[in-house]
């Protein structure tokens, strides 16, 4: 189980049909292919200094069952840094299968909303290895690959699911994701007010200015996708910026 005292910059690798892609606002039709070789992409991020990777099985998220596990296993065997994985994890069997591959932690999204008791049991069975993904739109929790909204507000759901003792909460504003329009600072601040669980930010991070703004919040890290692939953000620069701001906080 990976632990870090520093704020992590986590490159995202979204898998669909065996390729590394990015979706705009989670829409299937708005897909951009960034690599036909996700294993090579994972090695690239490791070589550039990534300490952790965020893998998402988009096919699994849409279909409710992981579809790219052979590829995930291949990635894990070819790199040395830890990875987290999400997408289609709706059963205890699926979670165990993924963890047995060597994934550091798994991300539970839709099923956490549908079955909070199951999440409590899961966190107890695999302490420190269960992350909760909260996908939000206008302050409301989104589920089923971002295709539906539920009745939970982000803050109410976070307060409730925190009782299960997840290792981390990953917050994504889906209206921002893939848009390169900046992160949801206000939503993150609201979330941080109601939970003590470490929070990782995702969605809309488009520039070093965004990285700097997030680095001043009390978060554990940030997941960056499209901006790394397009070159809007250099991984080394983002890591350096977080290190500088962390030093300033302690002075």
Q: Where do the language-model regions lie?
A:
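Structural preference for beta-strand elements that scaffold enzyme active sites
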Residues: 8-12, 52, 80-84, 105-107, ...
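Conserved, mostly hydrophobic/aromatic
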Residues: 14, 45, 53, 98, ...
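Conserved anion-binding
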Residues: 17-29, 96, 103-177
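Glycine/small-residue-rich loop that forms an oxyanion/phosphate-binding "nest" at active or ligand-binding sites
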Residues: 59, 65-124
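Charged helix-capping and loop-helix junction motifs
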Residues: 66-73, 147-156, 181-189
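Catalytic cores of alpha/beta
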Residues: 79, 83-104, 186-221
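C-terminal helical cap(s) of enzyme catalytic domains, especially alpha/beta-barrels
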Residues: 118-125, 130, 215-224, 228-251
């Amino acid at each position: 189980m990976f632990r870090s005292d520093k704020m992590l910059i986590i490159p995202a690798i979204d898998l669909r049909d065996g390729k590394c892609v990015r979706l705009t606002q989670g829409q299937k039709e708005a897909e951009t292919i960034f690599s036909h070789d996700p294993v090579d992409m994972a090695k690239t991020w490791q070589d550039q200094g990534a300490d952790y990777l965020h893998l998402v099985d988009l096919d699994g998220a849409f279909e409710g069952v992981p579809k790219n596990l052979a590829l995930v296993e291949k990635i894990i065997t070819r790199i040395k840094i830890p990875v987290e994985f999400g997408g289609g994890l709706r059963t205890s069997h699926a979670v165990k299968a993924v963890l047995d591959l060597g994934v550091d932690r798994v991300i539970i999204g839709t099923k956490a909303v549908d079955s909070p008791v199951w999440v409590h049991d899961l966190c107890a069975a695999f302490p420190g290895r269960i992350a909760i993904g909260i996908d939000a739109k206008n302050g409301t929790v989104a589920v089923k690959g971002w295709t539906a909204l539920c009745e939970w507000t982000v803050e109410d759901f976070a307060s409730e699911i925190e009782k299960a003792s997840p290792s981390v909460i990953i917050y994504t504003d889906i209206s921002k994701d893939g848009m390169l329009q900046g992160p949801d600072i206000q939503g993150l601040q609201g979330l941080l007010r109601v939970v003590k669980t470490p929070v990782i930010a995702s969605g809309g991070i488009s520039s070093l200015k965004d990285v700097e703004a997030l680095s001043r919040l009390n978060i554990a890290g940030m997941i960056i996708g499209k901006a790394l692939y397009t070159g809007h953000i250099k991984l080394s620069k983002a890591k350096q910026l977080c290190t500088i701001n962390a030093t300033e906080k302690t002075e």
